[in-house]
Amino acid sequence: MSAAARHYDTILSPVITEKSTLLSEESKVVFFVPLSANKGEIAEAVEALFKVKVTAVNTIKVHGKTKRFRGIPGRRNDQKKAVVTLAEGHSIDVTTGL
């Protein structure tokens, strides 16, 4: 697999919530990433895809909740989020095009 394709597989989607919008004011962007992605891969992918400088990456595993569907208990999938801190003067606007 080429490097560009690997970068697109690393960043699944941006997280657009009230909390992530507040973090964007601090030069931080939140993305959903695969459970197998590590911090180095995430930083490399963000730098390559968005042409910005990354200073730090923090990751969070969000465990899926147990929910009931038609009376049968089921479980939502686990997810992993990455909070990417950008260098001073760099920014990413993930809300354009929505």
Swiss-Prot record:
PROSITE patterns noted in UniProt: RIBOSOMAL_L23
Entry GO terms, CC: ribonucleoprotein complex; ribosome
Coiled coil: none
Keywords assigned by UniProt, alphabetized: Ribonucleoprotein, Ribosomal protein, RNA-binding, rRNA-binding
Subunit structure: Part of the 50S ribosomal subunit. Contacts protein L29, and trigger factor when it is bound to the ribosome.
Keyword Protease included in the entry's annotation: no
GO molecular function: rRNA binding; structural constituent of ribosome
UniProt xrefs under InterPro entries: Nucleotide-bd_a/b_plait_sf, Ribosomal_uL23-like, Ribosomal_uL23/eL15/eS24_sf, Ribosomal_uL23_CS
Biological function: One of the early assembly proteins it binds 23S rRNA. One of the proteins that surrounds the polypeptide exit tunnel on the outside of the ribosome. Forms the main docking site for trigger factor binding to the ribosome.
Protein name: Large ribosomal subunit protein uL23
Protein's UniProt keywords contain RNA-binding: yes
Gene Ontology biological process terms from the UniProt entry: translation
Lineage: Bacteria, Pseudomonadati, Pseudomonadota, Alphaproteobacteria, Maricaulales
Family statement: Belongs to the universal ribosomal protein uL23 family.
